[in-house]
Design a protein with these regions (language model features):
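Catalytic NTP-binding/metal-coordinating core of nucleotidyl cyclase/transferase enzymes
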Residues: 1-75, 82
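Catalytic beta-strand-to-alpha-helix segment of the class III nucleotidyl cyclase homology domain
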Residues: 3, 44, 63-129
């Protein structure tokens, strides 16, 4: 997989929709699909505007790498500001460290810690370590 992933000290941004199953029931399949597409558009726009590189996405969650912590924080703030106008609430976590970079992405404790930080948040929050 060929991407320009940052190396050395990296700030990870993890995102996840809060209550996605409940939201699916409330909006219905078509409404949820439209909201999810808008959520992805908003997040990807914020990531790219602030130097982020999408590492992975699963369902409604993203893992994004940034070469700088300020860029990651600006992306998270911009995304949350825009998302606040819609039905989807997203929890986000930022964690900085020195992961091991492989041909397929990142491995290391820093990645696991970042995921745990994001998982403790609530929709609309950005947690920092």
């Amino acid at each position: 997989m060929q991407r320009d992933l940052p190396s050395g000290t990296v700030t990870f941004l993890f995102t996840d929709i809060e209550g996605s199953t409940k939201l699916l029931h409330e909006l219905g399949a078509d409404g949820y699909a439209a909201a999810l597409a808008e959520h992805r558009r908003i997040l990807r726009k914020a990531f790219s505007a602030h130097g982020g590189v999408e590492v992975d996405t699963q369902g409604d969650a993203f893992l994004v790498a940034f070469p700088t912590a300020p860029g990651a924080l600006r992306a998270a703030a911009a995304a949350q500001e825009t998302l606040a106008r819609g039905p989807i609430r997203v929890r986000m976590g930022l964690h900085t460290g020195m992961p091991h970079l492989t041909e397929e992405g990142y491995v290391g404790q820093v990645v696991h810690e970042g995921a745990r930080i994001a998982a403790t948040g609530h929709g609309g929050q950005v947690l920092l370590s």
